[in-house]
Amino acid sequence: TIGVHHVAVHMARQALQAGIPVDIALCSAAALSHDIGKFGCRGRDARRIPYLHYYFTWQWLEGHGVPTIANIAANHSTWDLEFENLPGESLLLIYADFRVRGNRDAEGRERVQIFSLEAAYQEIFRKLADMTPEKQLRYRTVYAKLHDFEQYLLSHGVDPDPVQRGACTACTPKAALLPRRE
């Protein structure tokens, strides 16, 4: 989740500076809470986390009085890209979630890794054993939409790679959006 937050907020800040309408606080809150529903998947639901956590995320956030965050956070599946009119915050969250993967090291600790869009796509195909031709087509379609979104961001000077050293040439952060240490 922290890796997804890092990528999403990194891009949201630049997007806003580039004139793309995005609510950084909403993007941040949704990215931090997008997988909170995994904690609601217990008992017989535990094996269905990949399918049910969206609902439990929405239920928890809605129940705590933050419906706007709930709508973005709960709709972060790549399959949500099949709908055409998604807010920028949703696109940023879906894009970030697609690129960030948690993998276990030799000692069993989870390590967050940020992949390029292409490498993330390859990683998904490598890991999914039940990849039917229909799923392959859906993932290709999702990848194409995410690639188009990435190209759109790049065309506006948004650097999607948070590990790059140096600032994006198209943006200088607004002081009001920076933490005190920055």
Model-derived features: positions:
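Divalent metal-dependent phosphate-bond-processing catalytic cores, especially two-metal-ion Mg2+/Mn2+ enzymes
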Residues: I2-G19, S33, G43, T78-E182
